[in-house]
A protein has these predicted regions:
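Glycine-rich phosphate-binding P-loop
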Residues: 5-37
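Conserved helix-loop functional segments at active or binding sites
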Residues: 16, 34, 38-42, 103, ...
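AAA+/P-loop NTPase substrate/partner-engagement loops
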Residues: 35-75
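Flexible beta-alpha connector loops of hexameric P-loop NTPases
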Residues: 63, 71-94, 125-141
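Conserved alpha-helical scaffold flanking the Walker A/P-loop in AAA+ ATPase domains
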Residues: 92-104
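Conserved P-loop NTPase nucleotide-binding/switch module
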Residues: 104-148, 152-153, 162-192
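Conserved NTP phosphate-binding and transfer environment spanning the P-loop NTPase/kinase superfamily
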Residues: 153-156, 162-280
Length: 280
């Protein structure tokens, strides 16, 4: 209710945040990921406003994945596992990050927020030398750099990403912001001009199949035949339902233990009233 304000708007598309170490790249991303909330007056972030559907994505080694289609990023695994219906109790960095992206899309996100510091390197990029030594047909991982433009153009999902070590994303970014002593400035033209001297050594890929919006979740075995299900809140880090722990440590947009409690209650309600293996 304070009238018009001025500032830097980040357009839809693929946006890269770059800059030297300790110049504020991750700080800006952190402000954006918490911009899905209203802030108290005087907080300093009142006008950092982010798309309400924005999801922070990171690698999450060891997480569980159940029947998720990660074939957009992972295919032809040596063990023969079907990546269109992928399940594991101990995901790697790349498979966990692939699943996190796909699940966010299934949930209806329009914006992914990523930081290279918390991402799996082999999920994000493969440099030219590695591609020459390990040919594409021998590599089951399609790196995010090969899909990020497609996510926006075909699926309407934008990406804002922090990068400090590789300039490869200059080629696919629509907008490039440099943080200089905590001050952002648009260097898209400069970065694109410099990138022309370092062309990407990769051929365009055909579009991948999008996420499955018709999945029909089934009730967890931990709830079957149980009338009284105990829900224990483990602070902001997670909840325990019938002694099955749901680890929320890497869901970085959660800000309070009460949110963990609310999520536990939502899961209990869904398990008892909604999940029947027939409805999506």
């Amino acid at each position: 209710h304070r009238g018009a304000i001025t500032g830097m708007g980040i357009p839809r598309g693929v946006t890269l945040i770059v800059g030297g170490g300790y110049h504020g790249k991750s700080t800006l991303l952190k402000a954006l990921e918490l911009g899905v909330y209203d802030h108290i007056a005087g907080d300093g972030r009142e006008y950092v406003i982010t798309d309400a559907t924005a999801v922070k994505i990171r690698a999450e080694d060891g997480r569980s994945i159940q029947n998720t289609d990660i074939s957009m990023f992972i295919n032809d695994l040596p063990n023969g596992k079907d990546t269109a219906h992928f399940s594991t109790e101990d995901a790697s960095g790349s498979t966990s990050q692939a699943a996190n992206v796909v699940e966010a899309m299934e949930a209806g996100t329009s914006l992914l927020l990523m930081d290279e510091d918390t991402s799996a390197t082999n999920f994000m990029i493969r440099d030219a030398l590695m591609q020459r030594v390990i040919h594409r047909e021998m590599e089951p991982i399609t790196p995010f750099i090969d899909r990020v433009g497609e996510l926006y153009k075909i699926h309407g999902v934008s990406t804002i990403m922090v990068a400090g070590s590789s300039g490869a994303y200059f080629h696919v970014a629509d907008h490039i912001i440099q943080m200089d002593h905590y001050v952002p400035r648009d260097i898209t033209g400069l970065a694109k001009e410099e990138a022309r001297a370092f062309p990407l050594d990769s051929a365009p890929l055909p579009p991948a199949k999008g996420p499955d919006f018709g999945r029909c979740p089934r009730t967890s075995p931990a709830f079957r035949g149980s009338e009284r299900v105990k829900c224990k809140v483990l602070g902001r880090d997670g909840v325990s339902l019938n002694r099955e722990t749901i680890d929320l440590r890497y869901v970085e947009q959660l800000a309070d233990a009460e949110q963990s409690a609310a999520l536990g209650c939502c899961l209990l309600y869904a398990q008892k009233r909604l999940l029947d293996g027939k409805r999506n």
